[in-house]
Design a protein with these regions (language model features):
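Hydrophobic cores of alpha-helical transmembrane segments in multi-pass integral membrane proteins
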Residues: 2-109, 126-180, 189-248
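Surface-exposed beta-loop interaction hotspot
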Residues: 117-127
Length: 248
């Protein structure tokens, strides 16, 4: 358990260093600090799979911890291959914030129930954080575009990919819910929150075809989406902090 704590703290330290280098316009230092943090964070994620005494994917793909890993992967990719590398690096700020939240979150895993021991649950827990990470980063780059009064990193592509991943998570989640509870949809907060997120971004994909929707309006809508996702997910995260856990 101590090893996990040291690893995630080290990753957060590297991300904090990357923020410093980015502010100081030391882009090379920022990039390598992000890469170092990502490597350490990957080790943290891998070790979580063994917290219960035997390997379980649920320890790896818990959203609070897996989503920053996905975000780190995307930021590294964009910082290396995007046309706007300097703008892409600014996303280390939300990466640092989400990793810091994970560092202070209970590190143990919630004991997996029988209805979670299915490939459909794994597919859901993998694709949903990918969707959330794309939504957050797309919102960040949209907000950056508003501040700089020009389109920065391609926030639209991130939101499209986020919608694809999130839609897959809803389908796999529905299959998992049917196998585990006998219904593809449960009348609970978790499912309604997912419905809100899906409808919000489904609307985003269509408003760009409406007359009168300027680029600024689209950016504002895209940036606001990150707030919608946060409001719909952090309630569940805070609630689950009180759940009994294995390993701390």
């Amino acid at each position: 358990m101590k090893e996990l704590v040291y690893l995630i703290y080290a990753a957060v330290f590297f991300y904090a260093a990357a923020v410093f280098f980015m502010i100081m316009k030391k882009n090379r230092g920022a990039y390598f600090s992000i890469a170092a943090g990502f490597i350490v964070y990957s080790a943290f994620i891998a070790l979580r799979g063994w917290l219960s005494g035997f390997f379980t994917t649920y320890g790896i793909f818990e959203g609070v911890f897996f989503m920053p890993w996905v975000m780190g992967f995307i930021v590294i990719f964009l910082s290396a291959y995007s046309k706007d590398k300097e703008d892409a690096l600014t996303a280390v700020i939300p990466l640092f914030c989400f990793s810091l939240f994970a560092a202070f979150y209970p590190k143990g895993i919630i004991p997996p129930t029988p209805n979670k021991l299915t490939i459909w649950a794994d597919l859901f827990f993998i694709t949903e954080p990918f969707g959330h990470a794309c939504f957050y980063l797309g919102g960040w780059y949209a907000a950056l575009s508003i501040v700089k009064k020009r389109k920065t990193a391609d926030y639209h592509s991130l939101l499209v990919w986020g919608f694809v991943f999130f839609s897959i998570s809803q389908v796999t989640g529905a299959v998992w819910a049917f196998l585990g509870w006998g219904s593809p949809f449960r009348w609970g907060a978790r499912h309604f929150q997912s419905a809100v997120i899906w409808c919000y971004y489904a609307a985003y994909l269509h408003i760009r075809f409406l007359k009168g929707w300027t680029d600024l309006r689209k950016m504002l809508y895209a940036a606001s989406g990150a707030v919608v996702v946060a409001l719909c997910t952090f309630g569940s995260h805070l609630k689950e902090m009180g759940f009994p856990r294995i390993g701390g």
